[in-house]
């Protein structure tokens, strides 16, 4: 009898730090919501933050290649996004 809790299936997760033009945080967040809302099977959450970056975006999907495509073809192409820093979570590490 195994008393270890069952392992949850891991899905690819990315955190994207976004720099936007000064004063455009809210409009970028709204544009992100519009761009991502039609993506079936993709979960996301975002928040404006203080510091070097303006917005933190968390994306998850069952396909890492799809996440990369969304970041490249949707997130980075939103007007007023000046730069991004993407961190793909290493699925084999952590809890």
Which residues does each predicted region cover?
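A compositional/biophysical signature of low hydrophobicity enriched in polar/charged and small residues
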Residues: 1-95
């Amino acid at each position: 009898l195994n008393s270890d809790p069952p392992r949850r299936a891991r899905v690819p997760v990315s955190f994207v730090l976004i720099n936007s033009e000064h004063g455009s945080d809210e409009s970028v967040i709204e544009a992100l919501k519009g761009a991502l809302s039609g993506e079936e099977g993709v979960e996301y959450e975002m928040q404006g933050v203080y510091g070097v970056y303006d917005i933190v975006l968390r994306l998850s999907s069952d396909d890492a290649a799809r996440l990369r495509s969304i970041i490249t073809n949707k997130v980075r192409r939103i007007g007023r996004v000046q730069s991004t820093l993407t961190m793909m979570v290493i699925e084999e590490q952590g809890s």
